[in-house]
């Protein structure tokens, strides 16, 4: 049952649907996906702990999640599309959620709640900012949007 949640949860080696969904979806779809749907899967993982005993395979899943998060962290550096970078970084954050929850400690649980809430607010705002950039510059590529800190003062604050 845990593995079924990990397939829907965007864990790198199991299922990599999230970046494709974010890139293809309109901005409102990306915001809803980042703010609500991924959090529902996190809630499922939190509730699932009470049903199953996952101590047997938790260390293997933690290792898999952190290795996948590291790979995607490196992939974020070489991407050229703003929405792809935001989506890959979401998968990295979800890898931390998986590792923290499967750690099976109180600190891991509290850290997961903080990451889930912060990710819901921040990633939605980042997608909205990326849409603002796209509407003004008509491109999601970093190359065409370089120098925005010099041109727009609001991006210095963000």
Identify what each model region corresponds to:
Residues 1-158:
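Core, highly hydrophobic multi-pass alpha-helical transmembrane subunits of bioenergetic inner membranes
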């Amino acid at each position: 049952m845990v593995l079924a949640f990990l397939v829907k949860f965007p864990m790198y080696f199991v299922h990599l649907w999230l970046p494709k969904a974010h890139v293809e979806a309109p901005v409102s779809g990306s915001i809803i996906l980042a703010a609500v749907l991924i959090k529902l899967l996190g809630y499922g993982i939190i509730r699932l702990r009470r049903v199953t005993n996952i101590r047997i395979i938790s260390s293997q899943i933690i290792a898999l999640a952190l290795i996948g998060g590291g790979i995607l962290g490196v992939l974020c550096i070489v991407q050229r599309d703003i929405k792809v970078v935001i989506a890959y970084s979401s998968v990295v954050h979800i890898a931390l959620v998986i590792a923290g929850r499967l750690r099976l400690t109180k600190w891991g649980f509290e850290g997961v709640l903080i990451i889930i809430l912060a990710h819901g607010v921040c990633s939605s705002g980042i997608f909205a900012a990326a849409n603002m950039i796209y509407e003004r510059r008509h491109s999601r590529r970093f190359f065409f949007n370089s120098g925005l800190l010099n041109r727009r003062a609001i991006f210095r604050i963000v």
